[in-house]
Amino acid sequence: ICSTIEELNQIFGSKYVQSNTIKGFEQFNNKDKFVVIGTPCQIDSVRRYIKKRKIEENFVLIDFFCHGVPSMKLWNKFSASQRNKIGNFNSVTWRNKVDGWHKSYRLDIIADSGEYHHTGLKFDDFFNLYFSNAALSPACFDKCKYKQDQSSADIRIGDMWGADYSKNKEGVNSVICFTEKGNKAVKEIDCTIKRHTFEEVLSGQMNFLPIRDNFFYRLNPLIIADSENWNEITTRFRKMFLKKRIMRKVKSIIKIFSKK
């Protein structure tokens, strides 16, 4: 829980793993005001918790358009591999926009020694595993009920993709208010607001459940297994990914020649 701007800055930035919220729950009370931000399933749990304790009025709940969350085991294995390379670290930033909003798929790590490391989407196995859906939690597939406009939050946020902002380098946020409390909170913020239809906002988001494909069934057992390390997982993934790219290329060539 943050109570100052300085503390808030420490958690600034996109995250691709869920936060451990147990200590946060322990500090909830009926005297202070809280803004809680988390994945849609986390926020649903918070809503149930505060509703049962009749302290909802003290809270503004915010979730976001969620692609899904990877297994914590995958993150732990990735972290261990990074520590072997650069030593201990306590600063990780996802989606750094130093090169612009549209080129923000990068991972930045600052080691305790002060050494700075970063990789882009093209070369980062964690990002590629994440976007292949192979590393997502099983609950994100057939049990997620928080896509599109399904939410227990007051406000949902995300990136505002689309042709209108294709040349914008700073980034544009989409904000959807589900409750009057959320609407009031957004109106009190000193920012520029431009209205869009819900369909326009949704068009740039993953609004359907991910599909369990061959990547998931072959890689997920390795991710879960304590005996498999990061290098073994990524080696298998790269081989599968290369095979898939080759198959796509062959199919596209066949499709081109079949039209002639």
For each of these PLM feature ranges, what is it?
Residues 1-260:
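Iron-sulfur-associated redox domains of electron-transfer enzymes in respiratory
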